[in-house]
Amino acid sequence: MATELQCPDSMPCHNQQVNSASTPSPEQLRPGDLILDHAGGNRASRAKVILLTGYAHSSLPAELDSGACGGSSLNSEGNSGSGDSSSYDAPAGNSFLEDCELSRQIGAQLKLLPMNDQIRELQTIIRDKTASRGDFMFSADRLIRLVVEEGLNQLPYKECMVTTPTGYKYEGVKFEKGNCGVSIMRSGEAMEQGLRDCCRSIRIGKILIQSDEETQRAKVYYAKFPPDIYRRKVLLMYPILSTGNTVIEAVKVLIEHGVQPSVIILLSLFSTPHGAKSIIQEFPEITILTTEVHPVAPTHFGQKYFGTD
């Protein structure tokens, strides 16, 4: 099961103890820290998601600089083809309590895969600039498969009865009909095979969003969906969430085709805090499923996956 972000009901005073041996003391907390308790009781299954809302642009890692990210255009080929590629400046001046309040608002919508060493290794290889393209693609496909599997777990099932080869009646479940996938080109297409490996007959639509050369605003260049998409639940595939702008435009197009945000599940590998917040603030009913929330997004994903780096 995916894990929801949670914040404490209130911040402890400087002279109060936190009633958990695994929770950092108030002195150890930094503005913007969110404590995430994954499913499982052992120490290895616990992780901290750091929302670095106090960083100014000048103190961000070099990877967040617009030059390092390859420019500020949305979904441009020059910036890894990951689409959501405008440079990310973490908002400054927000307090921890403000982040907690926001996390309460999005807690049920932002879901994280439970962290373990396997997922952590895959994330590490994907972020490693020295990784070969073969290792990168292998690790990316594995991580995509894990995200897709959990995404399918968010879809509705219904009970059914089957008969085994020995004549035994077995009570099980099966998918309710009416699901589809939509990939945001180009990087979202990397996730299509993972979805087809799990659902051989699922229908997949596509949408292409790029920045306008004159206005630099996101513009929809192509959209093709199943004709009855308004009756389906949608797995929206986009591996890297940086600013969230591309996904916001894609959801607007889906809404124009009759899709309700409440039936959209966004499948992502990596997200920045700003990207997740922007999407949820725009569409509070959408569900975001990702493996990591981190201020540095691996925006090279699309270029390296498709061999255009």
From Swiss-Prot:
InterPro entries: PRibTrfase_dom (IPR000836), PRTase-like (IPR029057). GTP binds at residues 133, 142, 176-179, 203, 232. It is found in: Cytoplasm; Nucleus. 5-phospho-alpha-D-ribose 1-diphosphate binds at residues 186, 238-246. Uracil binds at residues 299-301. GO terms for cellular component: cytoplasm; intracellular membrane-bounded organelle; nucleoplasm. Keywords: Cytoplasm, GTP-binding, Nucleotide-binding, Nucleus, Phosphoprotein. Residues 13-26 have a biased composition (Polar residues). This is Uracil phosphoribosyltransferase homolog. It comes from Homo sapiens. The lineage of its organism: Eukaryota, Metazoa, Chordata, Craniata, Vertebrata.
